[in-house]
Amino acid sequence: MRVLLLFSAATLVAASPFTAKKPEPAKPLTAAQKADFTKVIQPMFDAHCVSCHGPKKEKGKLRLDTLELTLKGGKNPTFVIGKPDSSMLLSRVFLERTAGDVMPPKSEKPMTEKQKEALYAFVEGQPIPDELAKAALADTKAALAAAKTAAADAKAAPKAKK
């Protein structure tokens, strides 16, 4: 009986959150990774994400309008550099457009394949190749221009009388 009690006590201590192995802290980003974020990733987030995950609205307590807030995450971690397969952000971005949790939402313009490739490379911890960065940026500029045009059209449209 005493052995069983000792075994049970040892098992409880081993399973306790106080003895559980803590996750490794994220490694600091390199200067090149910060530059990739600033030049390629942040503009993509501005075009596709910040309207719901920015200073005016924080869905899921997640903000993607600065590098620091992006790395901090929201209710869940956004991603860990070098671990793309465990990234909540990537899993949502790469979902089929028919899925319920796809990001950006179905009502918004989705990221292009080049933008997704650039985001994946960044989260993977790899440099974003120049050609991919240029293609992703061109797609981002087109998305921003389309959003600006749509906003101007909506503002100029006559308001319906009640």
Where in the sequence are the language-model features?
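Aromatic- and Gly/Pro-enriched helix-to-coil junctions and flexible linker segments
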Residues: 14-162
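Positively charged n-region of N-terminal signal peptides that target proteins for export
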Residues: 1-4
